[in-house]
Amino acid sequence: MAVKKRGLGRGLDALLSGPSVSALEEQAVKIDQKELQHLPVELVQRGKYQPRRDMDPEALEELAHSIRNHGVMQPIVVRPIGDNRYEIIAGERRWRATQQAGLDTIPAMVREVPDEAAIAMALIENIQREDLNPLEEAMALQRLQQEFELTQQQVADAVGKSRVTVANLLRLITLPDAIKTMLAHGDLEMGHARALLGLDENRQEEGARHVVARGLTVRQTEALVRQWLSDKPDPVEPSKPDPDIARLEQRLAERLGSAVQIRHGNKGKGQLVIRYNSLDELQGVLAHIR
């Protein structure tokens, strides 16, 4: 169903004057068991205004394991949408994990929430969560701005962020799809992407690949962009090697009989590169691994 847009934020405060998603979730914890409904999981569907598309499979499996052992500790919040079906307002991870755990029903608090309020609540509450990646946050901000025809300042006020932060996040949407994928996977941080926005569109993707391959920091990325824009030959200063990583590279090289490089990122992610000069050398490496 299409939602009628509201001019420049008129009525947004009224939409949000009711309980927030967080308040509803707190209410669901304290609610009397007689008021809870145990809904068949197949009659519940994800919220269409939920900005998050991907969830960490490992974290989801951990939650599913907990639910198998202890059940769903916090009921989800849903709204009826007809045909004896329900749409999630809060608790999609719990619903997915419940399915993964093999349970047939899930405890839920059912609340009548109109479309426009559901949009505002879902978008604002999800933006204010800390576990969205920058691209998910940017897409949610754009959706909020477009649905209610808000200015950037009104969006900033609604979600409790500065206008500059909102503007920088919205600019991420203009990046090439390849860079958006790197952002979504955590290969690039928002600071990297913001720096790359200073390049022409045809060089942004090249710059992103350069940053990821060399493991550049945000500051080094900013220096790289300045260098490319000014066409100066001075190279970006490489980061000093971590002595612990260098020792580990040496130990692995000695064990495998081949050169090894560890590219360690800022968030614990990275790459292990094993170099070989011939198929025979590769066979030797594989023999050590087996």
UniProtKB/Swiss-Prot annotation:
One of its GO terms (molecular function) is DNA binding. InterPro entries: Chromosome_partition/occlusion, HTH_ParB/Spo0J, ParB/RepB/Spo0J, ParB/Sulfiredoxin_dom, ParB/Sulfiredoxin_sf, ParB_dimer_C. The keyword Metal-binding does not apply. One of its GO terms (biological process) is chromosome segregation. GO terms for cellular component: chromosome. Keywords: Chromosome partition, DNA-binding. SUPFAM superfamilies: ParB/Sulfiredoxin (SSF110849). The keyword Transport does not apply. Pfam families: HTH_ParB (PF17762), ParB_dimer (PF23552), ParBc (PF02195). PANTHER family: CHROMOSOME-PARTITIONING PROTEIN PARB-RELATED. Involved in chromosome partition. Localize to both poles of the predivisional cell following completion of DNA replication. Binds to the DNA origin of replication. Belongs to the ParB family. This is Probable chromosome-partitioning protein ParB. It comes from Pseudomonas putida (strain ATCC 47054 / DSM 6125 / CFBP 8728 / NCIMB 11950 / KT2440).
